[in-house]
Amino acid sequence: NRIAVIGIIVEEPQEVEKLNQLLHEYGSYIIEEWGFLPGEKDHVISIAMDAPQDTINALTGKIGRLEGISAKAVYSK
């Protein structure tokens, strides 16, 4: 397993329900989740995970395919 942080920018709030479904699906790998609202529309969310790299990549890819949501993962060495 690897430790990773996935940074998520949500620009389309109507997609948050789909995002939450994905986070629930991968919940057993999520160590911590935190976020803030810098503007009225955009959300910034960070997810810390302890999971196999393929699992982290899969979640990051699924999140990134949601309309108006961007995601990038940063891994421990």
Per-range role (PLM):
Residues 1-77:
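Long, contiguous binding/interaction regions
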